[in-house]
Design a protein with these regions (language model features):
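Conserved PRPP/pyrophosphate-binding segment of the phosphoribosyltransferase/PRPP-pathway fold
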Residues: 1-100, 107-137
């Protein structure tokens, strides 16, 4: 699975050449989920994006502070409530242009909540990058 992450990360990197950014952030996993999975798929995708943009990657700046139920296990309408207040930012991002990377966007609840947290900490702009987008059922 990591090889696929590297492949898709390189494909994302090819698409971002025109983006101006100060920082690349992968959507964080809760530490418990990271331990059980063994890797953060968003981080693996974000590495080549950071390299292509020639800007830093910071996987520790934004943290998942609540171990939420897996979004994929929930009905669409329950996902926003499940992810609410699940993220925390550890430093001020005033004026920073952020690229937030994840693997799949379904309802967008996780990315939206993380972006909300980044904006509350001063991010000037946030570009969301995902490998895949699922369509409503």
């Amino acid at each position: 699975r990591l090889a696929l992450g590297h492949y898709f990360g390189r494909q994302l990197a090819r698409l971002v050449q025109t983006i101006s950014a100060d920082l690349v952030i992968p959507l964080p996993l809760h530490p418990d989920r990271l331990r059980s999975r063994g890797f953060n798929q968003a981080l693996e995708l974000a590495r080549p994006v950071s390299k292509a943009l020639a800007c830093p990657l910071d996987a520790s700046l934004c943290q998942r502070i609540r171990n939420t139920q897996a979004q994929a296990d929930l009905p669409w309408k329950a996902r926003r409530q499940n992810i609410r207040h699940a993220f925390h930012c550890v430093k001020d991002l005033s004026g920073q242009r952020i690229v937030l990377v994840d693997d799949v966007m379904t309802t967008g609840a996780s990315l939206d909540e993380c972006a909300r947290t980044l904006r509350l900490h001063g991010a000037a702009s946030i570009v969301l990058l995902v490998v895949a987008r699922t369509l409503p059922e």
